[in-house]
Amino acid sequence: MESDLTVEESETIKTRSRRPLTEHRRHSLLPLQWKLAHSSRWMAQVVASEFSLLAFLLLLLMVFSKKWLYPSKSRFHQRYPQNITKRVYTSIHSMSTGLLYICISKSCLSSDNEEDNFKMWTIHPAFGVAKISFILAVGLGFVLTVWLHLPYLPCLQRMPFFGLIGIILSFCEVTLIFLTLLLFPVNLWIYELKKNISVPIGWSYFIGWLVLILYLTCGILCYLNHKNFWSLIMSSSSINATCSSSVPVSLMNTSQISKSQADILDPTQDDQKPLSSDNIALPPNPDTTD
């Protein structure tokens, strides 16, 4: 009876020891690709949201900075009267304050060159389109930053069409910023050709290219998450691993099959040996005695 109990106890111990192993394999090895894919997806979402926040802060820096141009480093290639030179400097200074700057001081309102400034910097088509696109870029950048941070809220983690809307907002933002960065120097070059001067561009303009790269990266990451790029990579890697593991097995099977076929086609060594004279049975002699 004791021996039976010990056997039963040993069997129960073995089954208990095997059960966690199978459960560990079931819960750790199988969902490993799922965990890696979803962790990569979440990391891409975090990077996209933080890049959008950084890009929006740089946009605000562009709005409030007054270093779009360097008026002190401007060079005149033609001599002008003092009043015209003053007008040119005033125009360059108003342009260096950025696309969202509006002069409301008394000096701007009561100056004699007020009409000239409006004609040159606000009524000019390239400058007007650049100002509108920059205003839209700032507003859309705020919307995109808020949108990409919504998944941090637990109740909004499963929003439909989240990735698609993020892609559309990101690439619209990239288009608006690129249009602004393209039209601003075009307007400046037209003015330089008209007045025969050269004005260097400031660091606030070049920050816009960094903002463009950040928003473009956000759009690419949103596109990869929307197309389930990380799960596709994990599935392709698992398929390659299974194919590589099945190749040696198939080679072993083919070698075994070829060996068995060779054994069937070739006769054995016993069949190939010639019969000796001792082993040959002679027929009996006929009886000649009558």
Curated annotation (Swiss-Prot):
Membrane topology of the entry: Multi-pass membrane protein
Keyword Glycoprotein: no
GO CC annotation terms, alphabetical: motile cilium; outer dense fiber; plasma membrane
Residues modified as Phosphoserine: 28
Source taxon at top rank: Eukaryota
Protein species of origin: Rattus norvegicus
Positions of transmembrane segments: 44-64, 132-152, 164-184, 201-221
Region called Disordered, residue ranges: 262-290
GO terms of biological process kind: cell differentiation; spermatogenesis
Major place of residence: membrane
Role according to the record: Component of the outer dense fibers (ODF) of spermatozoa which could be involved in sperm tail structure, sperm movement and general organization of cellular cytoskeleton.
Gene3D superfamilies: 1.20.140.150
Name of this protein: Outer dense fiber protein 4
Subcellular location: Membrane
A Pfam match: PMP22_Claudin
InterPro entries, A to Z: PMP-22/EMP/MP20-like (IPR050579), PMP22/EMP/MP20/Claudin (IPR004031)
Keywords: Developmental protein, Differentiation, Membrane, Phosphoprotein, Spermatogenesis, Transmembrane, Transmembrane helix
